[in-house]
């Protein structure tokens, strides 16, 4: 086999690989010999079919298999011989007349085109300084959590006859929504439950029901926001005919042992302990998130190297498609943004470059330090995922068994976390005690006002390139995506009430 490098421009590589016809012929002969004892042909005893007859009958078909196998084997050998690490599976283009190769009259010649993983030096992580935010779980924090827990457990009791509804009360209502006097699709419901002040219905709806009594029939006038999710309702005035069937007031929930028993605990003391431990776990996760974010920022700052264009383009397309998909839920396109689409694309391309750079960095750290994901870790992650789908565990396991990409997406965040932990062990990490609010604050909050389009890329994205780089760098910035819609209000039977739901909220501007 002869390998010639025909292009080495930047990270782009082209190799010309030539395999002598004699080598193909030898492989063909070996395969035909194997077939001799397996093929059953009329007129010949088992194992007595002449190779010449097999060549005449099956020669081209078998030679096709030989060529396919040889291309795969020789392309991998060429990469090893040249010490090249492709970013993606190389594209293969056969050269010359394939018929001549099949007939054994010409060598097998093909061209390999690909981009290589860049070579770069990793920083000395022992010289990297990072700050880790920490906060103490205080008694008053547990008190707040207890009150919130009690609030979620509250029951409602009917108000006295003739009593007026107040904010926080639970109403049972029938309503019919109309625009220009005509009822519209999805604008009606019977026996709908509405907690005044919950914000589940469009702005202005709930406030107008303060003061109503059982038996009242009233009209609620609202204006659907211009950016409302349902295009046929956006920007229009509507009137809802509302009949009040029941008014209930929230009953006081006492912070006592009885409340604890609702959660399977014997006393309020045990409930406080359980809440405290749960909150410590939440604080630790937030602390780690801030550390990881700071680490990724520092890694991005310390390393600069050429990136494979195809990897960046693929990452950009993934980000942009997600962005357009989320815009479509608001009946918008990129043309509706306050910024020129070209500027938004440029900003997202920088995000794509950052993601690819960090992915290559983390993969390099993992490879050089033999960091791997064990079967036990993978099985544990799979079990945790299965617990999210009670009753469907077997289907989930089958899905992962049959989909290697799904397993890869499960492995990626585990690999990344192990690499992050490895770097954190080497780096100079200084703890900084902050308040709970500071710990849970959005790290991008100060920058939100400087952007004029509502978009926020989820930081969690699992993807794996053909070179085996597992990464999802879950806390990288900037975070951008279209504002998510508010969930539809639900009636007791779970049926959505689109007309009465709150419109998509304008999200704070992000990064």
UniProtKB/Swiss-Prot annotation:
Keywords: Cell cycle, Cell division, Chaperone, Cytoplasm, Isomerase, Rotamase. GO terms for molecular function: peptidyl-prolyl cis-trans isomerase activity; protein folding chaperone; ribosome binding. InterPro entries: PPIase_dom_sf (IPR046357), PPIase_FKBP_dom (IPR001179), Trig_fac (IPR005215), Trigger_fac_C (IPR008880), Trigger_fac_C_sf (IPR037041), Trigger_fac_ribosome-bd_bac (IPR008881), Trigger_fac_ribosome-bd_sf (IPR036611), Trigger_fact/SurA_dom_sf (IPR027304). Its EC number is 5.2.1.8. It catalyses: [protein]-peptidylproline (omega=180) = [protein]-peptidylproline (omega=0). Its main location: cytoplasm. Residues 479-488, 499-511 have a biased composition (Basic residues). GO terms for cellular component: cytoplasm. Transmembrane segments: none annotated. Residues 455-478, 489-498 have a biased composition (Basic and acidic residues). Residues 168-253 form the PPIase FKBP-type domain. The keyword Cell division applies. Residues 446-511 are annotated as: Disordered. Consists of 3 domains; the N-terminus binds the ribosome, the middle domain has PPIase activity, while the C-terminus has intrinsic chaperone activity on its own. Belongs to the FKBP-type PPIase family. Tig subfamily. This is Trigger factor. It comes from Parvibaculum lavamentivorans (strain DS-1 / DSM 13023 / NCIMB 13966). The lineage of its organism: Bacteria, Pseudomonadati, Pseudomonadota, Alphaproteobacteria, Hyphomicrobiales.
